[in-house]
Regions:
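Bacterial N-terminal signal peptides that target proteins for export
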Residues: 1-11
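Bacterial N-terminal signal peptides
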Residues: 10-18
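Aromatic-Pro/Gly-enriched surface loop or interdomain linker
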Residues: 21-78, 82-85
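Short alpha-beta junction capping motif
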Residues: 26, 78-116
Length: 116
């Protein structure tokens, strides 16, 4: 599968999930470990703009940032995790994220290192 097909598939899945969820806002996942969780700052705003323009969602243009161990992650149907390098989850962080995913949350992970 080419990178372009994977990217388009990711957009389609993301838009599908957003369209059928009652809450439409997305959040950026903040994590420990020095993996640059804040990198690629235009990716999620561009996705939000695309979805708002093309499938009539009404998401806030600027996504919120939530920490992986926070109960606030349950307020968002989709979390976006980006960066490269080390990612560290404490046992509590991992349990919180696991509970989020088991409860139906969706985690989109973008390793933006740029190598093929």
């Amino acid at each position: 599968m080419t990178l372009k097909k994977i990217f388009l598939f990711s957009i389609a899945i993301t838009c599908f999930v957003i369209q059928f969820s009652s809450a439409q806002d997305l959040a950026i996942l903040k994590y420990k470990g020095g993996g640059d969780w804040y990198s690629n700052p235009t990716a999620l705003p561009n996705l939000i703009e695309f979805c708002n323009d093309n499938i009539d969602t009404k998401m806030k243009a600027k996504p919120e940032t939530v920490e992986v161990g926070s109960p606030d992650i349950f307020q968002y149907p989709l979390l976006h995790m980006t960066g490269h390098g080390n990612v560290f989850f404490s046992d509590e962080d991992a349990e919180n994220l696991r509970n989020y995913l088991v409860s139906g949350g969706f985690l989109h992970i973008d390793d933006n290192y740029g190598m093929q």
